[in-house]
Amino acid sequence: MKEKSKNAAKTRREKENGEFYELAKLLPLPSAITSQLDKASIIRLTTSYLKMRAVFPEGLGDAWGQPSRAGPLDGVAKELGSHLLQTLDGFVFVVASDGKIMYISETASVHLGLSQVELTGNSIYEYIHPSDHDEMTAVLTAHQPLHHHLLQEYEIERSFFLRMKCVLAKRNAGLTCSGYKVIHCSGYLKIRQYMLDMSLYDSCYQIVGLVAVGQSLPPSAITEIKLYSNMFMFRASLDLKLIFLDSRVTEVTGYEPQDLIEKTLYHHVHGCDVFHLRYAHHLLLVKGQVTTKYYRLLSKRGGWVWVQSYATVVHNSRSSRPHCIVSVNYVLTEIEYKELQLSLEQVSTAKSQDSWRTALSTSQETRKLVKPKNTKMKTKLRTNPYPPQQYSSFQMDKLECGQLGNWRASPPASAAAPPELQPHSESSDLLYTPSYSLPFSYHYGHFPLDSHVFSSKKPMLPAKFGQPQGSPCEVARFFLSTLPASGECQWHYANPLVPSSSSPAKNPPEPPANTARHSLVPSYEAPAAAVRRFGEDTAPPSFPSCGHYREEPALGPAKAARQAARDGARLALARAAPECCAPPTPEAPGAPAQLPFVLLNYHRVLARRGPLGGAAPAASGLACAPGGPEAATGALRLRHPSPAATSPPGAPLPHYLGASVIITNGR
């Protein structure tokens, strides 16, 4: 009896095992796997397979499974599913409404280290981070649709991020945190709708399952991502303030890296996409990795480009705390709507570009208009009456910012001087003809000059001085320029020296002090007279120290003889002075006075703060002075300064910007 019962139990178990074996062979799995399954695994896999048939009752469908007649591509069609899985950098999974995994591809083992058999039929909640359980529940829940669908089945798109358990070795796992790996899941929630008999518009729905593709971020097989022409990367702080940008950002957006550093990414994103970026930023801080949706990144001059970013939080190796964010960005399109400005930076950039184009076009038009006059000016160039000047490096930079060598007043800094209006010489070694004016003005004042720099450069000469060629004034200038220098005292004069006009009879009005203050006035340097300083009072009454002159102490016999010869030559030149040096005719009150030719000396001015002695003259110059009987004969007068002519100790230093304007701002 006992033997019969033992034999019966053995036979039953054998039949049961046989049935399980037959059932395992029906599973869509390789025989090498099914032969090693236990009974529980076979039941679990079978129930999951049956649920999958309910979700996809037609399987692969007529297009793949059963062709009408044999063909050369039959083998490829049968293996199409496996080929797609190998091509896809991820794994496919189907989850029921209760969280049970109905299907997952064998490629999950590449990303998670978990086998297909182990995952299929088990709850997905066992393999995701506890903090992501609520999110997974929300993904599997479908709210009542707002409108009734006429279709029996419809789908709701889903895209989310899960931290799934990863048991791979550290060298193959990629980026993991506490044994979990961020997986980007994208797919749809399949819903089946049933119509009720009670009402035509009443219906109920059933959640069939979630079909999704999981991809690891970044791809686990790539440790160093190669950046192509449509890609750039940036490093930012945890609040998305940019710290470093790849130089490729210039090619795709127009921004230089230094334009975006220390600025937040939110300021350069389309306003309609800020919410999506904020949500991705939140997920990034919570889960450590994220792939953003497609968003619009504003370009520099207008419009935007579509971008998708793969961002990762980098942790400190010592403290294991979040340190910064590294993002690899894929630019998907060219710049769209280039004429549309959506930010203040785009507007300012467009305005600056338009102003530059306008200035360039204006300069080109002026060049065309002045070209005939320029040709005429070339034929009237005269030789330089001065010896080659020597400039310092700072003075050279200052000379390049104005109309150099021109006897007219320099234009304001805001007005661009056309290069054609500036005199030039074809034989000059150095042309001081800038094609544009700087957008800022220099600070005016006294600058030390080094006479040993740029000794080989030749300054340009103006084409017209306002008097005929070879006039006595020109000879006088040449004579004065050859006077020897003594000590550290030098002659300085500011451009313009003589105001030029279309005719010698017309006298230009004296420029006001406020306009001359902002003009780019170059300064020249000439040898100083070591014996006497002559000048004309060109300063307002408020500056008595600049209006009177005195005779210097007695000289030695040899120097006195040379000085007497020079005085005789000056008197001879003064008697033959032309119109520009003759005494001016009396004019009506209020009429603008003609600017005299003045050589200003800063010896006295610099003596207050510099190393020069206090006995130097205050200010001296040579002028064809009007008024008095001595002026009628062309003789020069020497004036002695009064006691009131000395400046008080706290008086501001005068700054000479022209022949008739003195600026008192002591900068």
From Swiss-Prot:
Residues 77-149, 218-288 form the PAS domain. Residues 356-389, 409-428, 500-520 are annotated as: Disordered. Changing residue 385 to A: Reduced nuclear translocation. It comes from Homo sapiens. Transmembrane segments: none annotated. Residues 336-667 form the Single-minded C-terminal domain. This is Single-minded homolog 2. It is found in: Nucleus.
